[in-house]
């Protein structure tokens, strides 16, 4: 999860987020190299007194600055498209959870179980226990098995929120009348916090998301206790 004065991303806990972090570093290196080259050329232009007053065109230079940007764009586009297809790919999910956005809370339904559903409200600041996080804790956490593919079906009843958990690389809009889907898989257990990431109304800031990823045997015990 995030911590005060954090400068980078949250620690990745899913294969998709790992890929996104690698892509970010890859793109940032390209931006750094281009910026360094531009600054170097500007410094040369400001410091040198040599000019080519008789030069009308330079086909070699024009060819280079046409081909080089195209190569750079391809180097950015190919890994980006690969990650986009990975995020859309859903292969035999082990569990399906339906998420509905409301004013101003989330409700969850485990569709593989006959009667396992609940609402998840933010815990008010006045009711927080020592060590709990302001504006991030909920009364009912979403418990999921780790190291298993989970499909999330996301929609809304009224407003237009967005269901997002940064450390898992998830952000999916919840739209009334439309069912969006995404997948998640955690490589380690823990609590993972998210929030509504679309300004959906007056209490947009009070729609936190808490996922509790646990080993399968603990998930089975939890699901049995909830039925």
Swiss-Prot record:
Cellular component terms per the entry's GO annotation: mitochondrial inner membrane; respiratory chain complex IV
Cofactor note as given: Binds a dinuclear copper A center per subunit.
UniProt modified residues of type Phosphotyrosine: 218
Annotated localization: Mitochondrion inner membrane
Keywords: Copper, Electron transport, Magnesium, Membrane, Metal-binding, Mitochondrion, Mitochondrion inner membrane, Phosphoprotein, Respiratory chain, Translocase, Transmembrane, Transmembrane helix, Transport
Annotated InterPro entries: CcO_II, CcO_II-like_C, CcO_II_C, Cupredoxin, Cyt_c_oxidase_su2, Cyt_c_oxidase_su2_TM_dom, Cyt_c_oxidase_su2_TM_sf
Transmembrane segments: 15-45, 60-87
Topological domains annotated Mitochondrial matrix: 46-59
Residue ranges that the UniProt entry lists as topological domain Mitochondrial intermembrane: 1-14, 88-227
Reported cofactor(s): Cu cation
EC number: 7.1.1.9
An example Gene Ontology biological process: ATP synthesis coupled electron transport
Record-listed Cu cation A1 binding positions: 196, 200, 207
Binding annotation for Mg(2+): 198
Membrane topology category: Multi-pass membrane protein
GO molecular function: copper ion binding; cytochrome-c oxidase activity
Function recorded in the entry: Component of the cytochrome c oxidase, the last enzyme in the mitochondrial electron transport chain which drives oxidative phosphorylation. The respiratory chain contains 3 multisubunit complexes succinate dehydrogenase (complex II, CII), ubiquinol-cytochrome c oxidoreductase (cytochrome b-c1 complex, complex III, CIII) and cytochrome c oxidase (complex IV, CIV), that cooperate to transfer electrons derived from NADH and succinate to molecular oxygen, creating an electrochemical gradient over the inner membrane that drives transmembrane transport and the ATP synthase.
Similarity comment: Belongs to the cytochrome c oxidase subunit 2 family.
Descriptive protein name: Cytochrome c oxidase subunit 2
Species of provenance: Ovis aries
Source lineage: Eukaryota, Metazoa, Chordata, Craniata, Vertebrata
Gene that this polypeptide is encoded by: MT-CO2
């Amino acid at each position: 999860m995030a911590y005060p004065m954090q400068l980078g991303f949250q620690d990745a806990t899913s294969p998709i987020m790992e890929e996104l972090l690698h892509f970010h570093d890859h793109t940032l290196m390209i931006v750094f190299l281009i910026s360094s080259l531009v600054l170097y050329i500007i410094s040369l232009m400001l410091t040198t007194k040599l000019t080519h007053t008789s030069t009308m065109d330079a086909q070699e230079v024009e060819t280079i600055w046409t081909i080089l940007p195209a190569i750079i764009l391809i180097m950015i586009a190919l890994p980006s498209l690969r990650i986009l297809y990975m995020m859309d790919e859903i292969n035999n999910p082990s569990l399906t959870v339906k998420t509905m956005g409301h004013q101003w809370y989330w409700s969850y339904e485990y569709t593989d179980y006959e009667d396992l559903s609940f609402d998840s409200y933010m815990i008010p600041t006045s009711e927080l226990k020592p060590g709990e996080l302001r504006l991030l804790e909920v009364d009912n956490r979403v418990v999921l098995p780790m190291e298993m593919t989970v499909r999330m079906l996301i929609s809304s009843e009224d407003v237009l929120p967005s269901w997002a958990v940064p450390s898992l690389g998830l952000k999916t809009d919840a739209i009334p009348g439309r069912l969006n889907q995404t997948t998640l898989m955690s490589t380690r257990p823990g609590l993972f916090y998210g929030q509504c990431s679309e300004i959906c109304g007056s209490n947009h800031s009070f729609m936190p998301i808490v996922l509790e990823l646990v080993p399968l045997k603990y998930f089975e015990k939890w699901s049995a206790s909830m039925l």
